[in-house]
C-alpha cells in the first residue's frame, strides 16, 4: 500500500510472525477444521437445506425453477449445485453430501477474509481474522449448512477484495462488477449490500479532507461505469436463460412479487425500526470524518473507511428495513466484523503503548486473538455439541421416503424435506407463504390439492405448519415410523354414537383397519370388517370389536409395503392387501411441485 504503516503496525509486521505464532495459528485452524467436519456430519438439518436441495434436484429431473418448482430465492446457487446433486443421486445421506460441497466455499470465505485483512491492514491481522471467523458460533453453524447464502458470502467478500483491496484499476473494476453481479444472482439481499457499498463510497469521498476534495475525476467516472456494466452481466445472462426457458415471468413472481407483502414481519410489529438507519449515520459520519482527517493523503485509509462504512451501513439497512431477519442474513457481514475486531487489537496496543510510554510486545495481540478463538470454539460446542449426532431425523425421513414411496408419488411437506419427491401443491410453506395465508392473500388449497393428486404420504407433524393445514393433516394422516400415511387415528376422532368412531375420507381409496397391530374385528359403516374396503369421500364410522383399543384406518397400499402402526409383526396377507407394490416409475417431467 502507498502509505506508511498505521499506528500499531510495529505489532503486526507483515512478515514478522514467529514460528510459535504460526504454530498457534495452525493449531487453531486444525481445531476449527475438525469442528466443522463434525458439524457437517452431526448438525441438525435446517429446513432451508432440503429446500435448496429439492430445487437443485429439480434441475436434474428436467424441471425449470419457478415454472415447475416454486422457490423464492435467486437461481444461481441451485444451477451451480445441480450437477453435483445429480452425480450423487437419491440417497438418505443427501444432506451430509451437500454440506461437503459447502466446505470449499467456507475455505474461500476464509481466504477472502485473510486477503482483505492483509491488504487493508497487515498479514498478522489477516491471519488472525481468518482464524477467528471459524470460531464464531453462528457463522460455523450457518456456513456448514447447504444454502445459497454460502455462495452469496463468497461472492460478496471477493467483490470487496477486488474493489477495496488496493488502488482500483480497470481490471479490478470489471472483476468486482462481475462478482457483484454473480452475488446478486445468488441472493436478492445483495441489493442492500450494493446500496451500502455505494453509500459508503459516496460518504468516503465526501468526507475526505479539502486538500483531497476532487470528488470524482474523469478516471473515477470511467471506473464506476465499468463496475456498473460488469455488475449487469450475470443478471442479464440469468434473465436471458429464463426467458428462453419461458420462465421469466415465474422468476419475477416468485422472487419479487411473492416476497413483497405489506405489513410483513417486522414491518408490522416494529414500524419505527427505520430510525436505526439515520441514527447509525449520525454516528458514522463524524467518526469517519475524524478518521480521514488524521492523514490527509492516504488511499489505504480511505479504503479502510469505505470497508468499515459498508459493513456498518449494511447492518443498519438490514436492521432498519428488512422485514424477516434470520441468522444467514449476517453471514457475509460476520467476516467483515471479525476483521474489524482483529484490526482493533494492534490499534489498542498502540494506545496502551503511548499511555505507558514504552514498547508493548506484539505477543499480547497474539494472545488476545488466540484467546478469542479458543473461547469462540467453546461457544460453538456449547451452542450445539459437534460430536453429538443431531441429524438423525432428516436421515430417517429420507430413508423412509426412498424405501416406502415411489418417485411419482407426491408427499406433503413444508419446504421440500423429502428432497426427491414432489409436493401435491405448488407453493412451499415458508415464512412469506405462511404470512400470505394468515393475511388471506392466498387461499388454502392443500386439501383440494391432496385430493386432486391422490397424495398418500406426508411428513411428520410439525409446529411450522399453518394451523389449518396442521389440523387437516392430523385428521387425515397417520404417523407410522418416519412418515405419515393417508388414514385416520381413530383414538383422536370424535365418537359417532355409542362406541362408534367417525372419520373423514377426502377421496375414494381402499383402506385397511388395523386394531392393536392386527386386522380389525369390528364393524365399518355397520358391516363387519373382513378386509380392505373401498371407501368413498365423506364421513364413515367404525365400531371397535371386543378388546380393541388402538385403531387406525390406513391406506391399504401402505400396509402392503410394510407400513403398519404396531410393534406386532404382521404380513400383508394377514391383512388382505396385495402381494407386492407396483414397480417405481420415473417422475413425470414438467409436473409441478
Per-range role (PLM):
Residues 26, 30, 100-120, 135, ...:
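Transmembrane-helix motifs of polytopic, lipid-linked glycan transferases
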Residues 75, 79, 89-108, 142, ...:
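Loop-to-helix entry region of an early transmembrane alpha helix in multi-pass inner-membrane enzymes
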Residues 124, 157-175, 207-209, 286-301, ...:
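Membrane-interface transmembrane helices that cradle and orient dolichyl/undecaprenyl
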Residues 129, 142, 162, 172-188, ...:
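Membrane-interface alpha helices of multi-pass inner-membrane proteins
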Residues 132, 151-168, 175-180, 198-206, ...:
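Specific aromatic-rich, kink-prone transmembrane helix
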Residues 142, 149, 192-193, 316, ...:
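Hydrophobic/aromatic-rich transmembrane helices and adjacent perimembrane loops
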Residues 189-190, 245, 374-500, 518-539:
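Extracytoplasmic
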Residues 209, 219-300, 313-328:
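Transmembrane-lumen/periplasm boundary regions of multi-pass, lipid-linked membrane glycan transferases
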Amino acid at each position: 500500500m502507498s502509505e506508511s504503516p498505521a499506528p500499531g503496525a510495529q505489532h503486526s509486521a507483515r512478515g514478522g510472525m514467529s514460528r510459535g505464532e504460526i504454530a498457534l495459528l495452525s493449531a487453531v485452524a486444525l481445531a476449527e477444521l475438525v469442528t466443522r467436519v463434525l458439524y457437517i456430519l452431526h448438525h441438525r438439518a435446517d429446513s432451508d437445506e432440503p429446500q435448496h436441495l429439492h430445487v437443485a434436484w429439480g434441475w436434474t429431473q428436467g424441471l425449470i425453477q419457478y415454472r415447475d418448482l416454486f422457490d423464492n430465492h435467486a437461481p444461481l446457487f441451485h444451477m451451480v449445485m445441480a450437477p453435483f446433486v445429480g452425480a450423487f443421486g437419491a440417497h438418505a445421506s443427501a444432506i451430509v453430501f451437500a454440506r461437503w460441497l459447502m466446505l470449499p466455499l467456507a475455505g474461500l470465505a476464509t481466504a477472502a477474509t485473510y486477503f482483505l485483512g492483509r491488504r487493508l491492514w497487515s498479514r498478522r491481522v489477516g491471519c488472525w481474522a481468518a482464524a477467528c471467523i471459524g470460531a464464531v458460533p453462528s457463522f460455523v453453524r450457518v456456513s456448514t449448512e447447504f444454502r445459497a447464502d454460502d455462495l452469496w458470502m463468497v461472492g460478496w467478500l471477493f467483490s470487496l477484495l477486488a474493489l477495496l483491496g488496493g488502488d482500483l484499476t480497470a481490471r479490478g473494476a470489471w472483476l468486482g462488477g462481475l462478482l457483484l453481479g454473480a452475488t446478486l444472482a445468488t441472493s436478492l439481499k445483495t441489493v442492500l449490500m450494493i446500496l451500502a457499498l455505494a453509500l459508503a463510497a459516496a460518504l468516503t469521498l465526501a468526507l475526505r479532507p479539502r486538500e483531497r476534495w476532487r470528488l470524482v475525476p474523469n478516471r473515477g467516472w470511467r471506473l464506476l461505469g465499468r463496475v456498473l456494466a460488469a455488475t449487469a452481466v450475470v443478471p442479464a445472462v440469468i434473465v436471458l436463460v429464463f426467458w428462453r426457458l419461458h420462465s421469466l415471468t415465474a422468476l419475477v413472481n416468485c422472487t419479487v412479487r411473492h416476497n413483497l407483502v405489506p405489513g410483513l414481519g417486522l414491518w408490522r410489529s416494529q414500524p419505527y425500526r427505520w430510525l436505526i438507519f439515520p441514527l447509525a449515520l449520525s454516528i458514522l459520519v463524524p467518526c469517519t470524518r475524524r478518521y480521514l482527517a488524521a492523514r490527509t493523503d492516504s488511499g489505504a485509509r480511505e479504503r479502510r473507511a469505505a470497508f468499515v462504512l459498508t459493513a456498518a451501513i449494511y447492518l443498519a439497512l438490514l436492521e432498519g428495513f428488512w422485514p424477516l431477519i434470520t441468522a444467514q442474513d449476517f453471514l457475509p457481514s460476520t467476516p467483515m466484523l471479525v476483521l474489524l475486531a482483529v484490526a482493533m487489537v494492534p490499534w489498542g496496543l498502540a494506545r496502551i503503548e503511548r499511555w505507558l510510554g514504552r514498547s508493548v510486545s506484539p505477543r499480547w495481540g497474539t494472545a488476545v486473538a488466540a484467546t478469542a478463538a479458543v473461547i469462540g470454539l467453546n461457544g460453538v460446542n456449547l451452542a450445539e455439541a459437534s460430536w453429538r449426532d443431531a441429524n438423525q431425523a432428516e436421515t430417517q425421513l429420507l430413508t423412509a421416503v426412498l424405501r416406502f414411496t415411489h418417485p411419482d408419488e407426491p408427499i406433503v411437506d413444508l419446504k421440500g424435506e423429502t428432497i426427491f419427491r414432489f409436493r401435491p401443491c405448488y407453493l412451499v410453506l415458508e415464512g412469506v407463504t405462511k404470512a400470505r395465508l394468515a393475511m388471506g392473500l392466498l387461499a388454502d388449497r392443500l386439501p383440494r390439492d391432496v385430493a386432486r393428486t391422490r397424495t398418500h404420504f406426508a411428513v411428520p407433524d410439525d409446529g411450522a405448519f399453518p394451523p389449518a393445514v396442521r389440523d387437516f393433516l392430523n385428521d387425515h394422516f397417520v404417523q407410522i415410523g418416519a412418515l405419515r400415511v393417508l388414514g385416520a387415528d381413530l383414538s383422536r376422532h370424535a365418537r359417532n354414537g355409542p362406541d362408534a368412531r367417525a372419520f373423514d375420507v377426502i377421496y375414494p381409496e381402499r383402506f385397511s383397519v388395523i386394531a392393536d397391530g392386527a386386522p380389525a374385528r369390528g364393524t365399518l359403516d355397520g358391516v363387519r370388517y373382513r378386509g380392505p374396503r373401498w371407501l368413498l369421500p365423506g364421513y364413515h364410522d367404525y365400531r371397535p370389536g371386543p378388546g380393541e383399543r388402538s385403531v387406525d384406518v390406513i391406506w391399504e397400499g401402505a400396509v402392503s409395503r410394510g407400513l403398519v402402526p404396531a410393534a406386532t409383526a404382521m404380513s400383508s396377507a394377514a391383512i388382505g392387501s396385495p402381494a407386492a407394490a407396483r414397480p417405481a416409475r420415473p417422475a413425470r417431467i414438467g409436473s409441478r411441485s
